[in-house]
Amino acid sequence: MSVQGIEGVLQQLQVTALQASGSAKTLPAEAGFASELKAAIGKISENQQTARTLAQNFELGVPGVGINDVMVNMQKSSVSLQLGIQVRNKLVAAYQDVMNMGV
């Protein structure tokens, strides 16, 4: 028997043992497209809030906040927003394509 065959059998035995002991990982109920989309929108919002806060701190003259940090965070926020808009546009186009399909 080859090493790969033994490793495959060993892996199957480990999975079976985990399932039998009841400690097998279960997927969260909300694992899917909706949760990923929600997380991405949350990240976009977080990027915008961070950039806004950093810009305000720079305007107020808070020590340790440089113009380069502000500009990088503003660009990061802008790029993530543009990406979100493009994803939304693709989703709308895909939805319209599905709705225009004949049955």
UniProtKB/Swiss-Prot annotation:
Keywords: Bacterial flagellum. It comes from the Bacteria. One of its GO terms (biological process) is bacterial-type flagellum-dependent cell motility. InterPro entries: FliE (IPR001624). Pfam families: FliE. It is found in: Bacterial flagellum basal body. One of its GO terms (molecular function) is cytoskeletal motor activity. Its main location: other. GO terms for cellular component: bacterial-type flagellum basal body. Belongs to the FliE family. This is Flagellar hook-basal body complex protein FliE. It comes from Yersinia enterocolitica serotype O:8 / biotype 1B (strain NCTC 13174 / 8081). The lineage of its organism: Bacteria, Pseudomonadati, Pseudomonadota, Gammaproteobacteria, Enterobacterales.
